[in-house]
Amino acid sequence: MKLPHELGPIHFIGIGGIGMSGIAEVLINLGYSVQGSDAAENANVLRLRRKGAIIHIGHRADNLGDAEVVVVSTAIKRNNPELAYARELRLPVVRRAEMLAELMRLKQCVAIAGTHGKTTTTSLVATLLEAGGFDPTVINGGIINAYGTNSRLGAGDWMVVEADESDGTFLKLPADVAIITNIDPEHLDHFGTFENIRKAFRSFVENIPFYGFAVMCLDHPTVQELVGQIEDRRVITYGENPHADVRLVDIDLAGGMSRFSVVVRDRKSGGETVIEKILMPMPGLHNALNATAAIAVAHQLGMSPDQIRGALAGFGGVKRRFTRTGEWNGAIVFDDYAHHPVEIAAVLKAARASTKGRVIAIVQPHRYTRLHSLFNEFAACFNDADAVIVADVYPAGEAPIEGADRDGLVAAIKARGHRLAMPLARPADLSRLVRQLARPGDYIVLLGAGNITQWAYALPGELAASAA
């Protein structure tokens, strides 16, 4: 039985979240009655209201109204008054991933998983399939600039979704095609150990049907190890690795663009298809690899090299992924969501390759537990930045952990030989510090998953005002 159209109002608790809002928007577009609540208004709430959703600010039992189904994310606590009342009424309570899975059962699905790069890769797959005439439905974990939203309802048979591994619920998703970009230690608060993370990703791949396939990055050692463990399912590998089925070659990352070619090897015939002179307006080796994963899917679905080249040349990017927010005195300011050491290092490497000037990194560590568990990795991930400014940790509701803080990270970065790392005493000091450091041609990159994005958009104006 598939998701019936006769459902009464579907109530989302925390509807403004990036994952919840995308599912809610697709349900609205399918004709379902959607309502919800959130702790505060945001752009997602306003967008859903414009589409007809009734959304309350604050959580109260009477917000449920005539709801017949309640959708919650793992961020919602058991004592939430709406959740408690729903259970008192014996209403069905559905986890976010379960509702996503119900939508996926209506289509053939590509699900993109990995510790990093999911959102960009999801956007790239969506862009390619749209250009190929597949008219896909898309549910992403970030705002796709071309859509102005994180979801779209297509009339075609395919759906493209970001598979969030953070709470393990990605194992509920019925994917026909699975992409794994990488596997690194993350979300240890849920998984406990890295071994448990590896096991979860193996299950994710093994869950695909026999007629599906997995696309896996051979450049990443943990993913490469997993490739060797998968039996009885079709695997297509990609990367710079010379043994990859879909190989990234001839890479030029200068000038804020990615130029490369891709060689697709047919295992049965031994023949090769070369997709030459691909240009993508997005910098960084990590993004070229994300594009290669998307190309692997597009090629399998029969898209031509010209279709692939055209789609990637017009790729509009994803909000908060190396997003330019402004310029001051010839220095360019960027906003990026990177909040894990691997992500930060990749973004700074891309910045280094894109400018002849210097790279100034401003980081707001996200969660004390993450900084504590990956402290040595954080201390070593800023090598491509000429200067590092470290803000206070964005707690995301967590209690402080001794030593895992702003000053501790600054000291650790310096101890590993970095010549210019400094603390940010308060956000109001940021423009003054940047004015002292920045020169024409420099890239100023603000990094983090907290409210540092607001600083990134305010900084160009503050720099201009302080210069007046």
UniProtKB/Swiss-Prot annotation:
<dbReference type="GO" id="GO:0005524">
    <property type="term" value="F:ATP binding"/>
</dbReference>
<keyword id="KW-0131">Cell cycle</keyword>
<dbReference type="GO" id="GO:0005737">
    <property type="term" value="C:cytoplasm"/>
</dbReference>
<protein>
    <recommendedName>
        <fullName>UDP-N-acetylmuramate--L-alanine ligase</fullName>
        <ecNumber>6.3.2.8</ecNumber>
    </recommendedName>
</protein>
<dbReference type="Pfam" id="PF02875">
    <property type="entry name" value="Mur_ligase_C"/>
</dbReference>
<dbReference type="GO" id="GO:0008763">
    <property type="term" value="F:UDP-N-acetylmuramate-L-alanine ligase activity"/>
</dbReference>
<keyword id="KW-0573">Peptidoglycan synthesis</keyword>
<dbReference type="GO" id="GO:0008360">
    <property type="term" value="P:regulation of cell shape"/>
</dbReference>
<keyword id="KW-0961">Cell wall biogenesis/degradation</keyword>
<dbReference type="InterPro" id="IPR036565">
    <property type="entry name" value="Mur-like_cat_sf"/>
</dbReference>
<comment type="function">
    <text>Cell wall formation.</text>
</comment>
<dbReference type="GO" id="GO:0071555">
    <property type="term" value="P:cell wall organization"/>
</dbReference>
<keyword id="KW-0132">Cell division</keyword>
<keyword id="KW-0067">ATP-binding</keyword>
<keyword id="KW-0436">Ligase</keyword>
<dbReference type="InterPro" id="IPR013221">
    <property type="entry name" value="Mur_ligase_cen"/>
</dbReference>
<dbReference type="InterPro" id="IPR000713">
    <property type="entry name" value="Mur_ligase_N"/>
</dbReference>
<dbReference type="InterPro" id="IPR050061">
    <property type="entry name" value="MurCDEF_pg_biosynth"/>
</dbReference>
<keyword id="KW-0963">Cytoplasm</keyword>
<dbReference type="Pfam" id="PF08245">
    <property type="entry name" value="Mur_ligase_M"/>
</dbReference>
<keyword id="KW-0133">Cell shape</keyword>
<keyword id="KW-0547">Nucleotide-binding</keyword>
<comment type="pathway">
    <text>Cell wall biogenesis; peptidoglycan biosynthesis.</text>
</comment>
<dbReference type="GO" id="GO:0051301">
    <property type="term" value="P:cell division"/>
</dbReference>
<dbReference type="InterPro" id="IPR036615">
    <property type="entry name" value="Mur_ligase_C_dom_sf"/>
</dbReference>
<comment type="similarity">
    <text>Belongs to the MurCDEF family.</text>
</comment>
<dbReference type="GO" id="GO:0009252">
    <property type="term" value="P:peptidoglycan biosynthetic process"/>
</dbReference>
<dbReference type="InterPro" id="IPR004101">
    <property type="entry name" value="Mur_ligase_C"/>
</dbReference>
<dbReference type="InterPro" id="IPR005758">
    <property type="entry name" value="UDP-N-AcMur_Ala_ligase_MurC"/>
</dbReference>
<dbReference type="Pfam" id="PF01225">
    <property type="entry name" value="Mur_ligase"/>
</dbReference>
<feature type="binding site">
    <location>
        <begin position="114"/>
        <end position="120"/>
    </location>
    <ligand>
        <name>ATP</name>
    </ligand>
</feature>
